[in-house]
């Protein structure tokens, strides 16, 4: 049996880039909670003792940007300079302007257009991917890397591993074989965790705790064997982290946000963008389409692409590839997808309820992935997707 190795990485919520994603989406939540027609393009950057929020926002909402920044940093665990940032004492800079009137008239007619008439907020192409290798219909390498990162945060916050600090990265290499186009995982080949820690803990203690409290609860035994390679804090020391260790910027973890390197990516980031930005809404609808194809037995694995022109409601193209795993020809699946899903941005926002903010709705997406999550706020993952051509064959 011929096999291959594939690797996916993740970072947890204390990584400086992910900190920025979360702040941008917390701003989006605050705007949409008060004004569902808010137009938000919010970027964040951070470095030692500083967070800056900037971009274009047109909203009726009264938003305290500085409070959102400090609350988000504090919730993550950035409560002192020692851990990488002090939420209560760092500098917060805000440079927010209104959306360009040129874009506003072209996309939503200054809010005069009906939902079906709303154009895409920009040009671009987005991809959705699904595979039957996990119950989430997501790639196993990505799922495991993501869950390891989430578990790191869990054992830090609940006190199981008090030596942990907010920043951290994970990476998982899985050995697969190709079964007529479908990807079938065999085992975990290599597992890597690099986590920020305090001065009190030894490397041996770090390795022991990570194996017992992070790896063991996350990685199913069937995927581990005597040949599995573990790299646990291989650099030997990771005390300085967060924005103190590295600069952070919104939108720099787009592969972690999606499919861990599987499928394809159009290049557009998600966080801080309202649903007229098809970088986000377009990616959500094609994930739902791809997931529906696999969930309904039309294929074991598939990718869906959609593309847009700024100001134009209808997509320029829709593409489906099932990697040879389709139960019917791809062109027939494409026809079903076009009949089952409305790819116009205004209708995506309605059908996926993307104008609803608050309750950390989009903040939750900004760490540990936008896809494969079991949460009713992740409407693009829900069972409410159109039943696209179910098959029992």
UniProtKB/Swiss-Prot annotation:
Cofactor: Mn(2+); Mg(2+); Co(2+); K(+)
Binding site for ATP: 15, 167-169, 235-238, 246, 252-253, 269, 273, 277
Bilayer-crossing regions: none
Gene Ontology cellular component annotations, sorted alphabetically: cytoplasm
Chain positions recorded as K(+) binding sites: 43
Residues engaged in binding Mg(2+): 9
Pathway: Amino-acid biosynthesis; S-adenosyl-L-methionine biosynthesis; S-adenosyl-L-methionine from L-methionine: step 1/1
Localisation per UniProt entry: Cytoplasm
Binding locations of L-methionine: 56, 99, 246, 277
GO biological process, one term: one-carbon metabolic process
Cofactor: how bound: Binds 2 divalent ions per subunit. The metal ions interact primarily with the substrate. Can utilize magnesium, manganese or cobalt (in vitro).
EC number: 2.5.1.6
Catalytic activity of the protein: L-methionine + ATP + H2O = S-adenosyl-L-methionine + phosphate + diphosphate
Domain of life: Eukaryota
Keywords linked to the UniProt accession: ATP-binding, Cobalt, Cytoplasm, Magnesium, Metal-binding, Nucleotide-binding, One-carbon metabolism, Potassium, Transferase
Matching InterPro entries: ADOMET_SYNTHASE_CS (IPR022631), S-AdoMet_synt_C (IPR022630), S-AdoMet_synt_central (IPR022629), S-AdoMet_synt_N (IPR022628), S-AdoMet_synthetase (IPR002133), S-AdoMet_synthetase_sfam (IPR022636)
GO MF: ATP binding; metal ion binding; methionine adenosyltransferase activity
Pfam families: S-AdoMet_synt_C (PF02773), S-AdoMet_synt_M (PF02772), S-AdoMet_synt_N (PF00438)
Similarity section: Belongs to the AdoMet synthase family.
Role summary: Catalyzes the formation of S-adenosylmethionine from methionine and ATP. The reaction comprises two steps that are both catalyzed by the same enzyme: formation of S-adenosylmethionine (AdoMet) and triphosphate, and subsequent hydrolysis of the triphosphate.
Quaternary context: Homotetramer.
HAMAP family, per database record: S_AdoMet_synth1
Name used for this protein in its record: S-adenosylmethionine synthase
